[in-house]
């Protein structure tokens, strides 16, 4: 349940991104870090996010990403050069139609919506 809660929270963020730009459905995502090696977590994420997942083929992806962003920030690289500098990624999970997971996500969304007032009214 804890892992599903994390996956559903990530889906909420992804839905906000998708809603902000309807032209780009964000159908593929890249994973990095320790969790990206566990096939059960990858599949849960793919199913919950409704996206294909690709694992970054780089053991220090977070450090590399930070260095690339810093390089852009100081003008060493232009943003459009990042694609060529990004490490390769291998497909690791495709989303499945998991009706039981979808039902649990619907409950999560409903319960989360009920708590919204706690954060907007200070109750």
Which functions belong to the PLM regions below?
Residues 1-123:
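Glycine/Thr-rich phosphate-binding loops that ligate phosphate moieties of nucleotide
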């Amino acid at each position: 349940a804890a892992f599903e809660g994390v996956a559903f929270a990530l889906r909420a963020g992804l839905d906000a991104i998708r809603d902000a730009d309807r032209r780009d459905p964000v159908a593929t995502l890249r994973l990095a870090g320790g969790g990206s090696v566990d096939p059960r977590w990858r599949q849960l994420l793919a199913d919950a996010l409704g996206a294909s997942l690709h694992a970054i083929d780089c053991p220090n992806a977070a450090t590399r990403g930070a260095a690339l962003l810093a390089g852009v920030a100081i003008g060493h690289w232009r943003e459009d050069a990042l694609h060529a500098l990004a490490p390769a990624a291998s497909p690791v999970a495709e989303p499945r139609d998991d009706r039981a997971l979808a039902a649990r996500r619907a409950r999560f969304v409903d319960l989360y919506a009920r708590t919204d007032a706690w954060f907007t009214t200070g109750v």
